[in-house]
Design a protein with these regions (language model features):
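Pocket-lining segment of extracytoplasmic ligand-binding domains
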Residues: 79-80, 154, 159-230
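Short, glycine-/small- and polar/acidic-enriched structural segments
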Residues: 20-147, 152-155, 171-177, 190-194, ...
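C-terminal motif of bacterial Sec signal peptides marking the signal peptidase cleavage site
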Residues: 13-16
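Bacterial N-terminal signal peptides that target proteins for export
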Residues: 1-6
Length: 230
């Protein structure tokens, strides 16, 4: 009898630890612009709000998770959202919140002798294979009056970029400003950032309307602003 009771209690405890199957699954990666969502999670507000934060190491993982039906919502840039909708006709995406506008948080770092954008000709540049990475690279090329054929472009997720730069596999890298100190310790200099592209890089909270109803969308916005005011 004691053994049966113990097993029953263990089963109840395990069931209690299972994620809510009805919770909205929001995909994100650790980026400063998404901090209110992480704060809400740390404060224990997400579960009571019917939200489950699903963290990925890179934006590429978030996009893959959304395409594969593992997410109902995500923190993305505007261009990534448009590319996601274009690549997945079964999604019915809606942007419910603009979370921030980049003003220096996305940047291009390079080592000497690269000091200007024009100096990038013939250099190896690392960039994450996302819509944001492609967009930022295209704007760099515009500003430098170069073409893609003038560079050697290597696809690198953010978490591999510092190591690649330190190993001298790349000469320049498009990345988040948060990677700056680690890159600068390896001799990199910031030569271009999103301050030169005002209003062009926008982070948003996007949902799939098939799985997130209007009431839940309002709750998501309220959760964000509650955390922002904390």
């Amino acid at each position: 009898m004691f053994r049966c009771t113990t097993v029953l209690l263990l089963l109840i405890a395990l069931l209690g630890c299972q994620p809510d199957p009805e919770a909205i699954r929001i995909g994100s990666n650790r980026w400063l612009g998404y901090a209110p969502l992480y704060l809400a999670d740390d404060l224990g507000w997400t579960a009571p709000s019917g939200v489950r934060l699903v963290e990925y190491p890179t934006t590429t993982g978030v996009l893959r998770g959304f395409r594969n039906g593992m997410l109902d919502a995500a923190m993305l840039t505007l261009d990534e959202t448009l590319a996601l909708q274009d690549s997945a006709a079964d999604l019915d995406l809606e942007i419910i919140l603009i979370t921030n506008v980049s003003a220096g948080a996305d940047a291009l770092f390079a080592r000497a002798p690269v000091a200007t954008l024009a100096d990038l000709r013939g250099q190896r540049i690392g960039v994450e294979n996302t819509a944001l990475g492609a967009y930022f690279l295209s704007r760099v090329l515009d500003q430098a009056q170069l073409t893609i054929d003038d560079l050697q472009v290597l696809s690198l997720p953010v978490h591999e970029q510092v190591e690649a730069f330190a190993a001298k596999r790349i000469d320049a890298v498009i990345t988040f400003a948060s990677e700056g100190p680690a890159l600068e310790s390896q001799g990199a200099r910031r030569i271009f950032d999103s301050r030169q592209l005002p209003g062009e890089i926008i982070d948003v909270l996007v949902v799939d309307r098939q799985w997130v109803n209007p009431k839940q969308r309002r709750q998501l916005r309220a959760l964000w602003f509650d955390a922002l005011r904390t």
